[in-house]
Regions:
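Long, low-complexity intrinsically disordered regions
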Residues: 2-260
Length: 260
């Protein structure tokens, strides 16, 4: 039986030490034989469902990341059974939790149960169309979001082209889609290879974007809209602090906070 309830304390007792050696970043995680080590992407989903929010990589809150609860042995190895970098693809594809750049413009996971509160806080009471009508978003973001009125999911390269980014067009595609993820309007639904003219996959897997509404439905995503956004934010901070009680207010703001 996995004992997630005190995983934060387990990390503090059993984690390997992160260091810079010969100019290279050494991952910080749990020892291979640590009973608290997460051993599969399915286990990682279970933990995300329990705690609600989880960045992919270590940050200012000790233990608050997938990195610190997995082994450092197989990162970027390409082994689908052991590599947490591969797991993120399976998790995004599963649709059981949300994956995207939600934490300080960096990647992480949010449980389905908590996503409506996250959306209510980050959207600040506005659906995207309402935000546009009020003059609160850029035309670049409007061009991106307009594409999802026609198709539920889009490869990053498709979205970039359709939204008018690239040579001679709009600039800062990556920054724009990151801001939309931070705002609760987009997520990464999958990672897929491109298809050649014969329909055969090739190359590295590419991010596939979608709206949270396409994943879980408008009514579900909007189910916390009756709450004040500030209250949703307070509950999210409280939830993270409950699982990581050593987190300071400053650290919480750095990892969770966002100034539009």
């Amino acid at each position: 039986m996995l004992m997630w309830y005190n995983a934060a304390s387990a990390w503090s007792k059993g984690a390997c030490i992160m260091a810079i050696e010969n100019g290279e970043w050494v991952m910080r995680g749990l020892r291979w034989d640590d009973p608290y080590r997460i051993r599969s992407w399915q286990e990682l989903i279970h933990w995300i469902d329990e705690i609600g929010f989880l960045p992919l990589f270590r940050n200012e809150i000790d233990g608050f990341s997938a990195e610190e609860h997995t082994s450092d042995r197989y990162w970027w190895s390409g082994d689908p059974e052991q590599d947490p970098w591969e797991w993120r693809q399976f998790i995004a594809r599963s649709g059981q939790v949300a994956y995207g750049k939600f934490f300080g413009k960096k990647a992480g996971f949010i449980s389905k149960a908590w996503f409506p509160q996250f959306a209510n806080w980050r959207r600040d009471g506005y659906d995207f169309d309402s935000r546009w009508d009020e003059g609160l978003v850029s035309l670049r973001k409007k061009h991106v979001m307009d594409q999802f009125a026609l198709k539920d999911e889009l490869y990053a390269f498709e979205l970039k082209r359709l939204a008018g980014f690239g040579k001679g067009g709009e600039k800062n595609f990556e920054g724009t889609v990151t801001d939309l993820q931070m705002g609760g309007y987009l997520l990464i639904r999958d990672f897929r290879q491109r298809l050649n003219k014969k329909g055969q996959p090739y190359g590295w897997p590419i991010s596939v974007y979608a709206t949270p509404e396409a994943l879980w439905g408008y009514e579900y995503i909007a189910s916390a809209y009756a709450e004040e956004p500030a209250q949703s934010k307070a509950w999210i901070y409280q939830q993270v602090r409950k699982n990581f009680p050593a987190a300071t207010e400053a650290a919480l703001h750095t990892v969770l906070g966002w100034n539009r």
